[in-house]
Amino acid sequence: MEKMLVGCLLMLGQLFLVLPVDGRERPQARFPSRGRHVRMYPQTALLESSCENKRADLVFIIDSSRSVNTYDYAKVKEFILDILQFLDIGPDVTRVGLLQYGSTVKNEFSLKTFKRKSEVERAVKRMRHLSTGTMTGLAIQYALNIAFSEAEGARPLRENVPRIIMIVTDGRPQDSVAEVAAKARNTGILIFAIGVGQVDLNTLKAIGSEPHKDHVFLVANFSQIESLTSVFQNKLCTVHMCSVLEHNCAHFCLNTPGSYICKCKQGYILSTDQKTCRIQDLCATEDHGCEQLCVNMLGSFVCQCYSGYTLAEDGKRCTAVDYCASENHGCEHECVNAESSYLCRCHEGFALNSDKKTCSKIDYCASSNHGCQHECVNAQTSALCRCLKGFMLNPDRKTCRRINYCALNKPGCEHECVNTEEGHYCRCRQGYNLDPNGKTCSRVDHCAQQDHGCEQLCLNTEESFVCQCSEGFLINDDLKTCSRADYCLLSNHGCEYSCVNTDKSFACQCPEGHVLRSDGKTCAKLDSCALGDHGCEHSCVSSEDSFVCQCFEGYILRDDGKTCRRKDVCQDVNHGCEHLCVNSGESYVCKCLEGFRLAEDGKRCRRKNVCKSTQHGCEHMCVNNGNSYLCRCSEGFVLAEDGKHCKRCTEGPIDLVFVIDGSKSLGEENFETVKHFVTGIIDSLAVSPKAARVGLLQYSTQVRTEFTLRGFSSAKEMKKAVTHMKYMGKGSMTGLALKHMFERSFTQVEGARPPSTQVPRVAIVFTDGRAQDDVSEWASKAKANGITMYAVGVGKAIEEELQEIASEPIDKHLFYAEDFSTMGEISEKLKEGICEALEDSGGRQDSAAWDLPQQAHQPTEPEPVTIKIKDLLSCSNFAVQHRFLFEEDNLSRSTQKLFHSTKSSGNPLEESQDQCKCENLILFQNVANEEVRKLTQRLEEMTQRMEALENRLKYR
């Protein structure tokens, strides 16, 4: 009775202290929050006593996305510090870890990091805002896999130490949370989910433990999160409810902070009353890979098969039983498996007998003639209809028709074919007789059989004959005799000049000096070619009124109609020539393109080795280039003006920075060509700390320093770094890269020599397309500060942008190529330009090598030596006010050495220094902090713009 009273008092106290998120309607304070209702929690004083001797492993997970501003982030830290106040923190009581997340997860400290509450509080105060994305699921996964591992300080599960996650978030996650949160809860982790502002309530419920009214909380803003402190003190410090209440759990009672939940044994699930348990039907939700039947068992399942099937060795698939495998069961023909037994089957054309095993041939015509007009005949597998002699089967395969032998056999009768009962014969038309071959016909010759009386010709007709006259004669009235015909008597038949009778007809004649035209009637003047060749190169041929020129065989007439040229034998076919087919007389020869020679077969072509066959005169190396060659120089040399001899670059100092476009329009294959281009330039320089210093930037949507001017002291190391350079492959922010180069790459911190040394500063900017930002501002600043700018563009590079980048004169500092095949020529010209710059500098050597010069501040460049660490340490007030800057964790090794050497040197640095200097340093620090803040704000705005731009490009 006493336990029940205590439990009721505790639960009553919670009802007054906490108003958690719940699906049921409860009285709640409401206020506007963009159209949503958010629950207000009352401010309740903390309990006087802490959670003494309370053993727990507690991990805070804090949303550090960009949507959380600086003020709200400070409120979250205050909330954590308030929670820590009532916890008994120590290795044997409560252990505390903390993660914060954005696009990635940052482990601020693990469960084993700190042993005292003061250490945890100090770490919370030093946390820095990540200000990136919202990967909530990733943070929970990290806590499950790493933060609660024994290696990170979590106590073993066998010790039954509660594992608790307290997660604070203010927005919709960018990844999935439900599955990973459920997995964490199933391992025994208790999750409190706290939402601030416009958080989706369903998302919070997917994260938090059940019942949601005890583990899911929602407040309007970060200022109200402190109202939850007392709620969590009650939940984290309460006694075990299972021991003081009549819980009525059917199987197990599990304590939760301030409450309890019922759990079931393996193979059972909790009923809707949240107390009783029922057997879990594992087959109800999925078949578990069972091919046919899934049968539920207590805590498990088995796969079973239908009748006629057996379970395979994998326990899931089913195989049909082969009843005919061992014997044919007396079947005469075939044994066939049925669903749960077997049956006998006969071959085609046979039927199964009554014993269901033997077979008999089928008599298809016994019961019916199947509609056959003449005869029904049994075949192998069916009945066929057959016709009597002299008949053939119709397309219906049943009725018959008389055979048309004349149509079927095509006997070749010249006139007519006549069918008979069993065959056919040929017959001739009237006036014809059948020839002995029985097929062809001959006309009856009436003229040969009787005396017809015809004077000249007798002509057979269909049934008799007629007399006819020879050509040039006409039949007389007796129809037998003939008289010569006068064709010109009645008409001149269209003759232009005169009509003359001939033996058989007439002919037109022309006067002297004329010839008859092809129409046989009109006349033309005599042959035009007889008077001259009329300029015809080969032959002149007269036409009706004039002439035409013709060419000999193998030639064709040109457009002038007079001269001739040889036929193009290569026009329609190349005759197997690999490169070119060229006409040669009346034949052809094969020829090759420049840079190639003809092979022995006279058709294929082989590349010429011009360097091998020519006295090229190259001092170092000869390289074939089509039908010509190029001279190249060894490492450290450049080509002289004659294009053949080589000269060494002056080994003077130079600070050279490559700015390389790594955008996706370039492509990985061309990026390799650019890397060869860079190493070629490096080969022409005497790389050392005192001579040539080289740095390299790669850019796309961001700028990446591959190595600085002080990165390498030898060409070998530098070329190796270029070879291993990774392709970025995104946008093209050339202006951003020029800004980075101007502000950072040529600073003494990154290895540049100060302007006072007058060491030439050279930048080689390579790009293959239009920049996505402005290049003119930073290109102008770089040139104004003495940096010689070379612009190299390939492909789609914009000439106007290249001109804005390049130094004057443009023709010496701008190089453009349509493709990457001419990069070698550009490389040689660049080497010459760089060598000229070295020669103009007079071969000066930089004695400072890699050390930073200890000189006065140069007004033209914001070098980091303007204010040194030892100057800061000399100002005691500044050092005390900003002691965080000089703690061990925040100083580099070099700064620590300087600090200790200053203290041990015995110099009067503290009070003897000029106080004005200290005040100036503090003023500078304030101004610098303000500038850093402005730059940070601009960087955030630029980052947002870049992300929006990348998203637009992604979905184009």
UniProtKB/Swiss-Prot annotation:
Annotated S-S bridges: C242-C253, C249-C262, C264-C277, C283-C294, C290-C303, C305-C318, C324-C335, C331-C344, C346-C359, C365-C376, C372-C385, C387-C400, C406-C417, C413-C426, C428-C441, C447-C458, C454-C467, C469-C482, C488-C499, C495-C508, C510-C523, C529-C540, C536-C549, C551-C564, C570-C581, C577-C590, C592-C605, C611-C622, C618-C631, C633-C646
GO molecular function: calcium ion binding
Cellular compartments annotated: Secreted
Family annotation (SMART domains): EGF (SM00181), EGF_CA (SM00179), Matrilin_ccoil (SM01279), VWA (SM00327)
Residues annotated as glycosylated: N221, N890
Keyword annotations from UniProtKB, A to Z: Coiled coil, Disulfide bond, EGF-like domain, Glycoprotein, Repeat, Secreted, Signal
Any Gene Ontology biological process: response to axon injury
Annotated tissue distribution: Detected in a variety of organs, including calvaria, uterus, heart and brain, as well as fibroblast and osteoblast cell lines.
Coiled-coil features, chain-numbered ranges: 917-955
Domain VWFA: 57-232, 655-830
Domain EGF-like stretches: 238-278, 279-319, 320-360, 361-401, 402-442, 443-483, 484-524, 525-565, 566-606, 607-647
UniProt keyword annotation of Oxidoreductase present: no
GO cellular component, one term: extracellular space
Signal peptide positions (record): 1-23
InterPro entries: ECM_Assembly_Org, EGF-like_Ca-bd_dom, EGF-like_dom, Growth_fac_rcpt_cys_sf, Matrilin_cc_sf, Matrilin_coiled-coil_trimer, NOTCH1_EGF-like, VWF_A
Record bears the keyword Repeat: yes
Job description of the protein: Involved in matrix assembly.
Name under which the protein is recorded: Matrilin-2
Species for this entry: Mus musculus
